[in-house]
Amino acid sequence: MQNYLTPNFAFAPMIPERASGSRVWDTKGREYIDFSGGIAVNALGHCHPALVDALNAQMHKLWHISNIYTTRPAQELAQKLVANSFADKVFFCNSGSEANEAALKLARKYARDRFGGGKSEIVACINSFHGRTLFTVSVGGQPKYSKDYAPLPQGITHVPFNDIAALEAAVGEQTCAVIIEPIQGESGILPATAEYLQTARRLCDRHNALLILDEVQTGMGHTGRLFAYEHYGIVPDILSSAKALGCGFPIGAMLATEKIAAAFQPGTHGSTFGGNPMACAVGSRAFDIINTPETLNHVREQGQKLQTALLDLCRKTGLFSQVRGMGLLLGCVLDEAYRGRASEITAAALKHGVMILVAGADVLRFAPSLLLNDEDMAEGLRRLEHALTEFAATSDNP
């Protein structure tokens, strides 16, 4: 198939055509077990019947009406998010980048309205990832993503992740917000320590700064709780969500307390497609399935099984030195001898019929459906073991 798309993506050699649950079939009819979940998006697997029904019902009612009006699906999903989190208000958009852009803009506007123009600095983490807009790619602490787009937005300070002393040194009266991923996703599935996030909360309180948690990847059940902050004994001021929020239908959301959200008066921010009725109808139905004790317990149980199985593969193949993460968001850290070869290993896995991800050059990422069953897990692990064994046997590394 000829490619008419811009070359900013390196496409895999297969073309997915249809999918159901945790199984995908390409244009040649070959089957794959999906351990990637569309990069932590397909939280209920592919084409979940309840989501198909929700989308089908809404598409016969209302597609788009603009944010001159509100709609029942948008209000219903917002109510569910508010009722099950710290937040009082929700801003809907289309992606994680847009959710983080809104969060950062809100933080700066809130600080300006309340404290004047001198309180605008944003503190973020090295190796973080918050999106691809010019603002969010600048806040993300990875120069490889931002260096080609200078001059970049200013007033951003980066500190090492999980380095409490560096965070304490950086946050001050000039700080309007600290933004942190509870688990750094793109940089290796690296969880924040409880002490680090609790220190961030304390510093923000001390200096009248806002704590923004980027839960684009960790939210909506991936860690075994609805939101990852629930593991840490803290509450943010602003939270970003996307990916699994729509389970494959594009939607993002920024959640905030009423006091902070009040800084966004009419005209201060917006989104043409934010709160789209179809997206919110799908998101609302997905929320009902994800936010249940049965689903969240299943995530914790299956996550433990998958982590144990991956550790077993580590012992058998010698490719990994560590498995880390929470729930069904896991990363396998490559052994020193195989560092930098994560992409080669994911390609080898694909040839054996299993879809996995990279998280940087040294980590294999797993973000399967939250409904992953034992049969699909076992078959995926069987295929993965064949791929890893073959890779280790034919690799140039000792």
UniProtKB/Swiss-Prot annotation:
It is found in: Cytoplasm. PROSITE patterns: AA_TRANSFER_CLASS_3. Its EC number is 2.6.1.11. Pathway: Amino-acid biosynthesis; L-arginine biosynthesis; N(2)-acetyl-L-ornithine from L-glutamate: step 4/4. The modification N6-(pyridoxal phosphate)lysine is found at K243. It is an enzyme of class 2 (transferase). It comes from Neisseria meningitidis serogroup B (strain ATCC BAA-335 / MC58). It catalyses: N(2)-acetyl-L-ornithine + 2-oxoglutarate = N-acetyl-L-glutamate 5-semialdehyde + L-glutamate. Homodimer. May also have succinyldiaminopimelate aminotransferase activity, thus carrying out the corresponding step in lysine biosynthesis. One of its GO terms (cellular component) is cytoplasm. This is Acetylornithine aminotransferase. N(2)-acetyl-L-ornithine binds at R132, S271. Keywords: Amino-acid biosynthesis, Aminotransferase, Arginine biosynthesis, Cytoplasm, Pyridoxal phosphate, Transferase. GO terms for molecular function: identical protein binding; N2-acetyl-L-ornithine:2-oxoglutarate 5-aminotransferase activity; pyridoxal phosphate binding.
